[in-house]
Amino acid sequence: LDAYDEQTLDLFVNQPLSGTTGFSSLYINAGRMSNKGLELNAKVDVIRGRDFGVTLGLNHSYNKNTIEDLGAVNEFFLGTFVIRKGLSYGTHYTLNYLGVDPATGNPRYEAPDGSIVNDQAKAGQFDKFGNYLPRHQGGVDFEIRYKALSISGLFSYQFEVQRYNNI
């Protein structure tokens, strides 16, 4: 079992620029991020014989990261995720979707003034909704051995992760 509490300084970030500069972005070193987590690895010989053996293994990791500082910039929007102080790196953002209007069947969004609109072009209040980096990930592996023949396999998993298709 390993535990860690790491600080990353001078993050290498692709900062978007105004189109008037003639460039779309600039790579800069900015900010600080913390990573805290646990890692567990275990392996056991269930059967250990001269000609036959079975081995099982388990690994699991948990990581929580937080953007702690971005220097002179408050936030970056990159694709479908936002880099903002206090959030985890890889946090998705989208329009604040409020569900379907039961009377019309149209989608409802929150506008910048707090009102509810059905027109996506008038919606402008963005909301975070998860992270594309898994908080938990791991796997279970096994090996079955008979004389000079062995068969092995690995099952992996991850959870507390959201994928988003921006099509």
What spans do the regions from the language model cover?
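Short, hydrophobic/aromatic alpha-helical segments in well-folded domains
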Residues: 124-125, 137-139
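Residue-level marker for the onset of beta-strands and adjacent loop->beta junctions
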Residues: 26, 67, 138-140
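Membrane-embedded beta-barrel scaffold of Gram-negative outer-membrane proteins
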Residues: 1-22, 54, 61, 65
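Membrane-embedded beta-strands that build the outer-membrane beta-barrel scaffold
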Residues: 1-3, 38-46, 54-62, 138-144, ...
